[in-house]
């Protein structure tokens, strides 16, 4: 597996599985099979409506969470919702994500960015 080193020193796999347009059942199976096949980067977003299934696929795979690079995205409608990140983590059934993005620069994305900055734990 090839990796790219991010500015904060974290290594991110160059190849991963995206879960856009996957039903919850398909997302769970795809994540499980991808991790069993050696993938270590999983991408999802709250707009995909499959975060719970992604979390189940990760748990089912038996791969240690610290060996997975998990990324998600916040949708503009939750940029100013103070509980948005905690709710995302609950849906994914994980204590952290490795990369969190603003899905698009719409709505109050400046507040969304500030909220994400406050949530960073090193």
Q: Model-found features: residue ranges?
A:
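Residues that form or flank phosphate/diphosphate-binding pockets in enzymes
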Residues: 25, 49, 79-80, 111
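Active-site beta-loop-alpha junctions enriched in small/polar residues
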Residues: 20-22, 45-47, 73-77, 102-105
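N-terminal binding-site loop/beta-alpha segment at the start of enzyme catalytic domains
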Residues: 1-68, 95, 118-121
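Short beta-strands and strand-loop turn motifs
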Residues: 14, 71-73, 98-102
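Glycine/proline-rich, positively charged
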Residues: 80-122
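Solvent-exposed, non-transmembrane amphipathic alpha-helical segments
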Residues: 37, 73-74, 78, 117
């Amino acid at each position: 597996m090839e990796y790219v080193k991010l500015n904060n020193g974290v290594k991110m796999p160059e190849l991963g599985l995206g879960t856009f347009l996957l039903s919850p059942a398909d997302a769970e199976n795809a994540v499980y099979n991808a991790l069993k096949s050696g993938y270590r980067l999983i991408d999802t977003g709250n707009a995909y409506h499959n975060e719970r299934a992604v979390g189940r696929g990760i748990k089912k795979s038996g791969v240690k969470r610290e060996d997975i690079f998990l990324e998600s995205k916040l949708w503009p409608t939750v940029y100013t919702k103070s509980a948005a990140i905690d709710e995302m983590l609950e849906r994914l059934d994980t204590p952290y994500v490795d990369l969190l993005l603003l899905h698009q620069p719409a709505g109050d994305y400046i507040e969304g960015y500030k909220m994400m900055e406050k949530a960073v734990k090193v």
